[in-house]
Amino acid sequence: MEKESLVLSRLECSMMRGLAIILIVANNFGHHVQRVHPDNEFVFCYESVAGFLESLNHIDSIFPLDLLSFYSPFGVMLFIFLSGYGLTLKYEFGSGTNTSSWSFLKNHYLKLFVMQAKGVAIFLCLFLLLFPDEIVYSGPLVRQLLMVANLFPNSPITPGPYWFFGMIMEVYIVYRLLFYQRSSILMMIVVLCSLIMMAVVEPAGDIQRYLRMNLCMALLPFCLGVLVARHWRTCTMLGSSKNCLILLGISLVLLTTCKFYFYSWLLLPVFVVAVSIAVVKLLLRYSNISSVFNWLGGLSGVLFVVHPTVRQLLLDRANESGHPYAVVFLYLFMTIVLSMILKPVFSQK
């Protein structure tokens, strides 16, 4: 597969990772800010929709943070999409075609485990320093490190955002054992089954949360990445700014509309990916901005692992501060600086 034929170039993928990590980092702190309405991520609550509509009808100084909370949960979907896209290019069309299933799963598990273990160590050091009298239970921590905590209903996950590690490992297993070099029709059938499962359970119930913290939520964006890598080899349609703007406008309207209804909410990853592709292709025309997102993309793994530690430091300020924007910017600044400092630690094999 020639490089120029790819829908998303290496640079565009890195920019998309940069966009995704900023959304993830912002989302995991923003909804703790006082007066900001929570968004629907794992469950669909009509109260959250009503809260956003109320803020839309009574715009005040906090509205930009409400808007951020409304759109920021999409970062995880982008990470999952890029995983599907990248794995397919490497292991079905690139240098990894001769990799055995055992080597594939072992290498990805160890990579996630080491990254997570370093993050947990940093988090625990801070947590025990700030709360020396608190008890840390080993059982939930071991389950989290082994990336099986998601499979246990109501099992505490420490730090909270690390639920992603267990979920993405489930995706890797299913991809390699079920989807790898097999018919895309089979993959679409499995995605349809997962959507039906989520559609028939209570939108705001515990089962919905359990399904979405595991494989079900990830299947649609991941398989979309696989399908794009397999079947959409050219992107001449998106070569002009006009077409990108049209795609961005249509997808953004559909994305926003889908967030207000439960069944369409399940299909959000499709429009999230479309919006993001249009955004990165438009930003590519501005070298200064694209270089920033490319840089953030290169730092995304460390940012993801480090940001829960910074969040823990500033949670009280988020809940009590009368200057929410100052706290949010302080959080983002501290997260980026700490990630830059610790990047060599996470780069070590």
Enumerate the language-model features and the residues they cover.
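Membrane-cytosol interface segments of multi-pass membrane proteins
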Residues: 1-194, 320-349
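Alpha-helical transmembrane segments and terminal signal-anchor/GPI-anchor hydrophobic tails
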Residues: 195-302, 306-331
